[in-house]
């Protein structure tokens, strides 16, 4: 029986700006996305019937069509005109609903894995075109590495990402609705916005100190107001020697960037006492088809 196993990597945002609201209700964004080496393990196994079955050790994610990985299997079947079944096992390690694109990354892995397992020969561009129908972050998760994302997040320009930079990420025990964060965002009241070009230059040069001073997420203004723990977590990251700290996506996960492994590990040991879902990670900057 055919089987494929893939790593489904998380992402963080090194900057996130919202440019305005579109006529279709979505928001126009400009952000820098960076993969990290925290990943879920996705195992795909061909079935003899035509059913799609999802299983996981994580009680917080659905195992039916409400799971974006299920819908990814459906959409690639429909696109290819085939009716094969598949078992999808998700070994969930990325925190759920955390602003880390865990679900989108799972969907990307299913698209890539079934493309390989069923020998569909779809190009990365074709996979990304399918992915955007599932969610704005899915195309980036197919691309991998680091990129500038524009539009609703689906217009991607690859960039040189951070190379093996040590980070600590921590998710507090709260949930955040992305739709509600965007609804509450008042662009006219923003105190500051990121300079994307300056962030890109700092990333390209590997200048972590300049990056720390330039990276900015406009959605923090909403999530921090609703959940003061975000501000406290950033303060704790800096207290434990982070060069810079920021919220990823709409939250609630906060990440800190560290000068070296020793400082990151020390921070991880301290922060994991305070926050259960804390991870010691590195940036990951290889695009999928470079591997």
UniProtKB/Swiss-Prot annotation:
Pfam families per record: GHMP_kinases_C, GHMP_kinases_N
Residues the record lists as binding ATP: 95-105
Reactions performed catalytically: 4-CDP-2-C-methyl-D-erythritol + ATP = 4-CDP-2-C-methyl-D-erythritol 2-phosphate + ADP + H(+)
InterPro entries: GHMP_kinase_C_dom, GHMP_kinase_C_sf, GHMP_kinase_N_dom, IspE, Ribosomal_Su5_D2-typ_SF, Ribsml_uS5_D2-typ_fold_subgr
Enzyme class: transferase
Domain of life: Bacteria
EC number: 2.7.1.148
Keywords assigned: ATP-binding, Isoprene biosynthesis, Kinase, Nucleotide-binding, Transferase
Gene Ontology terms, MF aspect: 4-(cytidine 5'-diphospho)-2-C-methyl-D-erythritol kinase activity; ATP binding
GO biological process terms held by the UniProt record: isopentenyl diphosphate biosynthetic process, methylerythritol 4-phosphate pathway; terpenoid biosynthetic process
HAMAP family: IspE
Family, per entry: Belongs to the GHMP kinase family. IspE subfamily.
Protein name per its UniProtKB record: 4-diphosphocytidyl-2-C-methyl-D-erythritol kinase
Organism of origin: Alkaliphilus metalliredigens (strain QYMF)
